[in-house]
Amino acid sequence: MKHMQNPAISLKPATKADEPRLSQLLSDYQSELLPYSGHSEADIATYKYLPHYFTDPERTAYFILVGHEVAGFVLVNTHTLVEPHAHAIAEFYIAPAFRRGGVGAQVAAQTFAQFPGKWEVAQMATNQSAIQFWRSVIH
């Protein structure tokens, strides 16, 4: 990450033209989850739901920007497992260079504010870092 004085953190809706970039970030994200999933690098496949984020009005994909740099993504949908009529964080990824500086917490707050109401957020039971992050964000 380039050093910037308090760069703005924002969400930018991803478009169909952004699909290759988002697909690459999803691949990076899935690679980072391998130690928690029990899968191998060979098991990483294309994120099968990605095309739906450009056609289904119940799904929204955002790039996370720190200044003008892409720092990750958040995928939001209404396909919840427990809470009907709610939104879900389907996937949430902050690139390593942007972690530990409050970016994730700010993005979570912006995302929740953009879609008021009930939310569902799930993590892998073995991913203690994710569990701690979401507990600190949600309180």
Please provide the spans of the model-predicted regions.
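Conserved beta-strand-loop-alpha-helix junction that forms the acyl-donor binding cleft
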Residues: 120-135
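Conserved beta-strand in the GNAT
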Residues: 63, 69-78, 88
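Conserved acetyl-CoA-binding loop of GNAT-fold acetyltransferases
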Residues: 112, 135-139
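A short beta-loop-alpha structural element at the N-terminal edge
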Residues: 9-24
